[in-house]
Amino acid sequence: MQLILLSSLLLLGLSLANGHETDPEGQILNSLVETVGRLEKKIDKVENAFLTVHRARSFGSGSERLYVTNKQVGNFEAVRNTCVQAGGHIPSPQLLNENKAFASVLERHNKAAYLVVQNSAKFTNWAAGEPNNADGNKLCVKADAQGAWHSASCDEDLLVVCEFSFI
């Protein structure tokens, strides 16, 4: 579709460059209008399909955020880089239902994963005795397989889970 649009634009450009000030019969312009119309319809279909899939994936959790793993493990920086490259970020659940959706991924894989806790967070899910950085080297936060939060070393290799917000 992009090739057709580019070809039409090229033809229009060549026509104008060869001294044709207009498209006398409107063929090139009409072709461009039709192509743009078809592209708009396809974009609408893709958007609707995407939203349908997103709603279906988030239906059980009630969360507008999607939590996905590639089943790899890594330290905090590696997880952050992986998530950024994928267009997401390290999970930062803001609500109970978001933490449940995040925890469901961890429970399926029976592993812990990093998360980011905002300073202004209204929701937290700290395990008993947490946060605890008594030894001074637990500068990160991880969620266990049940979704409870713990202080953690940023060097631990944990499950890569990324959060994607689409809406």
From Swiss-Prot:
Q: Where is the signal peptide?
A: 1-19
- Where is this protein localized, as stated in its record? Secreted
Q: Which Pfam families does this UniProt record tie to the protein?
A: Lectin_C
Keywords from UniProt, A to Z, are: Disulfide bond, Lectin, Secreted, Signal
Annotated GO CC locations: extracellular region
The intrachain disulfides are C83-C162, C140-C154
Q: Which residues form the C-type lectin domain?
A: 62-163
Q: Which GO terms describe its molecular function?
A: carbohydrate binding
Hey, what tissues is this thing expressed in?
A: Expressed by the liver.
* Self-association state and partner proteins as the record states: Homotrimer; non-covalently linked.
Q: What does this protein do?
A: Does not show any inhibitory activity against various snake venom PLA2s. Does not inhibit the endogenous PLA2 activities in various tissue homogenates prepared from this snake.
Which family, according to UniProt? Belongs to the alpha-type phospholipase A2 inhibitor family.
For this entry, the protein name equals: Phospholipase A2 inhibitor alpha-like protein
Please report the organism this UniProt entry assigns to the protein.
Answer: Elaphe quadrivirgata (Japanese four-lined ratsnake)
